[in-house]
Each structure stands twice: as structure tokens, then as C-alpha cells.
Amino acid sequence: MVNKENARSVGQQVKWIGSQDELPPVKNLEHKNVYFYQKCIYGPLTLSVGDFILVSNADAAEPDTVSGCDVARILHMYELRELTDREPCRAIVQWYSWPKAIPHNKYDDDEVAIDFSLEVIEEHRPYDNDVALGAIYRKCIVLEGTSKTSAEEILKRHANKLKSTACPMFVSRYRFVKVKRSYRLIPLEIHLEQPEDNARPTRSSRKSLTAHRESKRSISARHDDTAGNKGSSVEKRRRASMAASSSVEFIDVNSFICENKVSPIKIVGGRSVVRLSEKKNAPEINANYLPASPLTEKNAKVETPKSRASAARRNLNLSLDRGADTTADSDCLNYSIVQQTPDPKTPSNDMKIKLRLSERRRSVRLASMDVDPLSLEEAVQEPNAQGRKRLGVANGDIYHTPTKKSKEPLESAAATEQTPSTRRKSILKSATSRLAEGTPRRSIHLSNIVEQRVFEDDEIISTPKRGRSKKTVQDNDEDYSPKKSVQKTPTRTRRSSTTTKTATTPSKGITTATATPMTPSQKMKKIRAGELSPSMQQRTDLPAKDSSKSELQLAREQLHVSVVPKSLPCREREFENIYAFLEGKIQDQCGGCMYVSGVPGTGKTATVTGVIRTLQRMAKQNELPAFEYLEINGMRLTEPRQAYVQIYKQLTGKTVSWEQAHALLEKRFTTPAPRRVTTVLLVDELDILCNRRQDVVYNLLDWPTKSAAKLVVVTIANTMDLPERLLMGKVTSRLGLTRLTFQPYSHKQLQEIVTARLGGSETFKGEAVQLVARKVAAVSGDARRALDICRRATEIADTAAVKCVTMLHVQQALAEMIASAKVQAIRNCSRMEQIFLQAIAAEVTRTGVEETTFMGVYQQVETIAAFMGVTFPPPGRALRLCSKLGAERLIISEHSRNDLFQKILLNVSADDIHYALRVEEMVN
């Protein structure tokens, strides 16, 4: 924070030029003693209202460079005549953001083309626009242009005028403004009413946006003389906000009736969006309104007939070519909506769909229909002779195509007359089977308005349906009637798993065999193309299980502690408390600390990270201000001061020494920055960071108390009384009183957690899960330990070739988990190795010294072997046993070159040896 001495020094460096201005309506300054000016001199800079400047970003790695600054335009300059800690000479600015600071999903629109090296974007997010003049690095130049002109062209256009300047130059063509409930990139030539207001536009404003699109032109076009003469008598109207994706817009149906030109159709992201034409005269209020897609009104433009027709062909062909196959057999699909109106003075409601398919694709798609439902107009050009020859049809009857052949005998013997029974009010073609060569399929989709408007009730088209099974054909054999004979030409035959067509609907009659399962990417492509429609059952079902894995293997994978569960059972109250704390701090953009404690395995880290994921998802949906998330774990640090290095690396991506990282973090969290977002820091295993000086923990808990930091720290430790037992008083006071304790899980909660992980699998019996839950809850309540025991039980059951885990398997796993690893290693040793360990323990007990020699141990080996009736080993074999136990780290021994005088030391306790080598187990 700037102290008073620095504030006075900065104020003395600023020299105001001109007289004081009237008080403009600036928020937060209405009740303060301030004087506004138009111009000033600050050091070597001469600043005026309207100048573009570079403001140093305190959060950047190099704030004294162009890349470490933010671009802004000065709106007001004022001097604060009150004694505060802030700098008195300040400015109100309009921010401009670098393209990398805008979410990447905002660039998905095909009409947005950003040059990341030259452009800046006018920012309308609620950043603090009050900056000190001392933070200004230098002046710059921002050239505003239209979205139809590239950034390089704008720079070249002003190159001659700006040759002498050495200021950095940028181009601005878009603004990032809030429309309805989300932020969007809007070209500068589009002026919106109250861009940051969430209120819905009125119907008149929507009509103004629809009816007066022609006034949405470039900035250069506004200064054109001809455009100025034409528009001198027309009053400028402010544009309404663009329609959001969640809202419902209304358009007049009469615009479809009176429009007699081709409207371009653009396919965006697999969805077909009809670009509607507007009426040239202002629309009247009509009760006959239909809801339309927001994208429809967004893409609406007023164009000349020639440019509109060319745009239709260009947009449609580009959209189709992007998703088409690169092979020679790819579809050639083109369609548009035209009116069958020979005289433009006599409008008609009859509309037709003009469709052009490749001959090869047409012969496959329309083979099962006697008359194609999408008949061409008489003026459509007929296919060439070669295409007619390939189709086997006569001139003027290009859609009477022969039916397909099938290798099933029933299809060649009987065919049904086409009697469509079910009709739909759409021109949506059903997905057909793929060609053998792999020709991609594509369906035709139009909006509901066009579907209901294009065809009258007596012109509704039936959709071809697939053939039914053999059983249906045999049961309904008496309903068949002979079909009209049609001249057939040789077509490509395919193997079929079904039989002839039914009498009710026109069908393909040919269904391919079961294909290989589709990958998720292929499935999503088909859903976007409209060939598949996602159902609720498909979204809720679990992913397909791998047939090569058994049920026990799948259960073992789900029981692993590293698997992230879909939900956190039994921690709903703790989740809500952490969520409320973090959400409030992010909303208020202030700092704070929270201490989370609990025994290991109680879900502390999982609950906090689950809250963070929820908050990040809300921030992406613009329901919460953006924030940064950092995470450090004391177990992953070589020493406590490395926490500074990890935090700075996550903030900037650079690795520096801990001294430099500490200095830079101290500067960052104590220096105010107007565009700084809230930072959430998760410190796991806080007790490991507690060194003797406790400086690391003190700094991590002291930074959130700074008003300029906007830092929220969530600390996690296993000890409930860590602040009072280990931390000093000044550290404990900064930790605050916001504490949350995770209690150990009860047996019912552990049983619920294990059952949720199994996900309805029948690999565990209920009493087996209950036994694990009760055993673990009685000892520690550690959910990780319960999952490990269940996982080990599945391994034991899998080894025994059993498909279900019983209580015997759980008891065996419990016995292994309760015993230590050293005890397990001793039990798995050979008989002579166990005798050697027993001899070492006996020699240590006899001498009272933990360190002994091989000679004394060998004497004990001879005695124990004679007592147990075992042939005692020779000294050479005993030396080999000593070396093997030393390699297993059960004992610590010198090099074997010392022979009988090498020193031996037990690496396990004598109690572990006696526990592992009980007399009854040795006898057995």
C-alpha cells in the first residue's frame, strides 16, 4: 500500500494544465473533495483525457515492459484533496484486455477472427477503473476499426501518419460486453443499449435491431459522404442487446411470406441455423409471432440479393466441406429455400426446397421411394447424360430410381406398394446405412419455423423407415400386394440381415449387421450431425464395461484411493460450510483464512477440492467472479521455504530461488492492482511447514490480511489443536476463528462410502462390507484404510478363483493389514532365517547390548536348532543367511569380509520377532 510520504511525492510530480472542470457524474466520487482536469504533465509524459496509456500490472512477472502492462484509455483525471493513503492524482480509465485474457470459448464463433499479436479488446467486465497516475508506464496508440477489416490493414492504413511516433500501436475491433447473462465479443460497430445491464430488451428495441441492420456499418463507412447524405434524414437508433442462448426471441411470420429471395443457411457446430431475411420496411406489431432460435436473429443481416445468394452458397458449401470426407465419394449436398413465384408482384405462400445431391448419393438415398418427396422445380437443370446413364432413368423423370437388390430370396419374390401411414411436419431425413466405401452420411435439418412454413398440411413428407424383421414379414404375409414393376438397373448389392419391406411404410428393407461399437468421438459427431439423438437413458447409463476384465478387477479399480468419486457421501454439511465461506470471499473480493482439521482419511482434501471444482464451474458459467486457484502440499516440499517457489511458479510459470520468490510474492500481495482477481490458496499438511522460526506459516497467514492481496487461504492439518500447541501467538491470531473439524467416519458412513464406490456391483456380500466398516470405525474411522482392506479382499478372492468376496476373505485381509510389514516379512522367511533372527534376539537379550557379532549369534543358532530338533547349519551357510537378511533390511550387518567378527544389529524390534514367531505357529 502507498504510504502518505509516497503519495505526496507523486502529487508533487504531477503538474496540472488548464482550469478545473465541472464535476462529471462519476460513481464513488460524488461525495469526495476532488478536482477534475483535462490535461497534466507527469514526469516525461503529457497526459490528456482520451489518451491511450499502458498501466503497469503489479501481478505480472515484468511490470515495466509492454507485455507486463494493461492498455487503457483515460476518461477522467482528478486530484483528491483529502488526506488518505491513496495517491491523490488519479485517473478513471476504460480498460482494454489482451486477447489471451478472454476465455477461449468466446473465439468459437466463425465470425470472430482475432490477431493475438496486434489486437486489444475493449473490456466491460467490472474491474476497478480508478488507477493512480504513478502506475502509468507510458503512452500508446490504439486504432479502432471494424470487424470486416483485418488488423494489418488498419495498421497499414495509418502507417504514413504514425511513422514518426515511437509509441506501441494496437488495434481494437471488438468489445467484451455482457449481453443478457453472459459476456460476448461484439464488434465495435454494433452499439448496444446499456451493455452491462442484465435487463431484457423490449419488443420495440428488438424490432429496431431487426429492422435497421443496415445502419450497422464500419466506422469508416459512417464518415463516407454518400452514406452521410443518405442517412442524414434518418434518426439514429440504439441497438438492442444481442439475444442470449437461453432466451426466447420472436420473429414475424410475414417475413417468410413477403421475402422472395434466397436466404443463406449456415450450419454452426452441427446445428442447422436458418439465416432469416428481414423486411425492408419497418415491421408492424402482429399477434402471429413464433419463437425462434437466438442464433437465428443473431445471424440475421440485410444484404443485396446478389450478395445474399453468393453468401448462401459460400456459407453452405464451406460448412459442408468442413465436415465432409476427403475421399472422392463424399457427399455433394446443397439446398436452399425459394418461393415458387413467377411474378414478384404476386406473392405466394408456396415454398420449395431446392436440393442438389451427387448422383451416387442420390441413387442410394432415394432407391426405396417411387417418387422423391423433395421434387425439383421445372427450372432446375437436369443431370447430364452420363449421370442419367449411371442412374438408369429417363429424361424428366430423374427421381424414379430402381430399388435396391438384396440377397434375401423373400425380397426378390415379394415387394409391397408404398402406402405411407406416418407423416411428419419436417424435412428431416432419417439416418441411412453407410455405403461399403464409407461415404459419410449427412441429414438435413431446418428450424421448426421453416419446417412448418415450407409445406402445407397436404404436402407433408413421410420419412423412410427401416425394414422390419423376418418374423414380422412372415406374420403379415397376407397383407402384401404386388408392387408396380419398375425398370431396374444393376446397382451395388449388399448383404442383409433382414427381409423385404413392410406394407405400411416405405422402408429401406436392408439393414446391415451389427457394427463395431462407436467411439465417443464418433458418437458425438453423429449427434452433432443429427443422425443420432441423445436420450436420457444414454446420458445416465454408466460407461460400457470392459469385457476382458472380471467383476473383481472392475471393483478393484473403483476401490482404489486415487479414483475421484462422482460425489462425496456423508460430508454434505462440511461441503456447504466450505462452499459458503469461499463463495462469500470471492463475491466480496476480500481475503480470509480457514483452518480445516481432522484425522487422516476423513475426506478433508477431497471435500475442499470438490468445492473448488464447483466454484470453477460456476465461474466458467459467469455465475461467480473469476478467481485463481493455487495448491501446495507440505509432503511434496523438500523444505518449508520451497512453498514460496511453488506458489510463484503456479502464478507466473517461472522458477526462481526461494528468496526471490518471497520478495516477489511480498510485493504482489502488498501492492494494489486494479485488475487483480481473487486468489484461493490451498495449503495441505500445514504442520509440515511449521519450522522453528515459523516464518513460512506466518507469511502465508499474514498475506490474506492485506487489503490489496485478495488472497483466501484454506489450510488443512491432521491436528485439531495445532494453532495452540505449535504455532506462536502472532501466527495463531492471523489464522482467525474460522475453523472446521472433520470427525472420523462411523461404521454406517464407511459402509455407505464403500457401497457407493462399488456402484451396485454384486462382488461383495453385505456382511463382508459391514465387517470392514465396523473394524475400521472401531480403530480409526479412516476411509482410505477401509478401501484398502476391501481392495485387498478382492485380490485374495481373485487368487482363490471366487467371484464374490466373503467374510473369510475380509478377515484374511484384516489380519494382513493389522500386522506390520516387518511382521509379514518375518513370517514369509524360511525356517533357518527365522531361527537366525530368533538367535540374534536371544543374544541381544543375553548381553544387554543391541549390537552383537556373528560369532555370538552362531552359538545361539546351534543352541536353538538343537532344542528344536533341527540340523544346525554350517558357518558358511549361516553367513549366507546373514547376508540375505541384511539385503532384506531386517538386520544391519557389516561387510562379510570380517567373517566371524562382523557386527550385527537388529533393524526390527524384538517384540515383532516374538509376535511373528509364536510357538504354535512354529510347531504348525
Swiss-Prot record:
Keyword check for Protein transport: no
Q: Where in the cell is it found?
A: Nucleus
Please name the Pfam families in this protein's record.
AAA, AAA_lid_10, BAH, Cdc6_C
Q: Where is the composition biased (Low complexity)?
A: 496-516
The answer on whether this UniProt entry bears the keyword Transit peptide reads: no
* Coiled-coil segments on the chain, per record: none
On subunit structure and binding partners, the annotation says:
ORC is composed of six subunits.
> What is the protein name for this chain?
Origin recognition complex subunit 1
Query: What is the originating organism of this protein?
Result: Drosophila melanogaster (Fruit fly)
